[in-house]
Amino acid sequence: MLTPFCSSHHLQEKMNSCQSNPTKMDNSENVLFNDQNENFTLVAPHPSSSYLTRDQEHEIMVSALRQVISNSGADDASSSNLIITSVPPPDAGPCPLCGVAGCYGCTLQRPHREVKKEKKYKGVRKKPSGKWAAEIWDPRSKSRRWLGTFLTAEMAAQSYNDAAAEYRARRGKTNGEGIKRRWR
């Protein structure tokens, strides 16, 4: 299904004939490529494909980049090389995400991985080793007091709450209201 074109004049004639008679070429599925010698080639993808493969996308991008680099000094009107590309419409029906028939954006996107956020606790931080450290500000000595290293963030938060309960008379804040506090 390759049709070579020797010049831009032949290409323009072929495009005009295809626009006037759509049975000759379904221009929603064909891609035109040019080579170094200004020969244009009409490439039709496999009829069962509903979107471009990575190789087809790569070829289109490389061809477009060559076109831009080779015509960097020339204006678009005087350029004899043409690259016309069109992506075939997806034939799977309406998009399940946006509900639009023939949607290009949703069908080509990769699913995003959801990032699970860890709950933040006051006075608790994660160490590079993966363990959790707890420390609290001691108002008497005006320094941080080390409470220890724990396997889970909840265990470190409980340690912080216990230490904050000691300073409660001095308005110590805790992580959550439902956690049991010690009075001394």
Curated annotation (Swiss-Prot):
Its main location: nucleus. It comes from the Eukaryota. It is found in: Nucleus. The keyword DNA-binding applies. SUPFAM superfamilies: DNA-binding domain. InterPro entries: AP2/ERF_dom, AP2/ERF_dom_sf, AP2/ERF_ERF_subfamily, DNA-bd_dom_sf. The keyword Nucleus applies. Residues 120-177 bind DNA. SMART domains: AP2. Keywords: Activator, DNA-binding, Ethylene signaling pathway, Nucleus, Transcription, Transcription regulation. GO terms for cellular component: nucleus. One of its GO terms (biological process) is ethylene-activated signaling pathway. Gene3D superfamilies: AP2/ERF domain. GO terms for molecular function: DNA binding; DNA-binding transcription factor activity. Belongs to the AP2/ERF transcription factor family. ERF subfamily. Probably acts as a transcriptional activator. Binds to the GCC-box pathogenesis-related promoter element. May be involved in the regulation of gene expression by stress factors and by components of stress signal transduction pathways. This is Ethylene-responsive transcription factor ERF122. It comes from Arabidopsis thaliana (Mouse-ear cress).
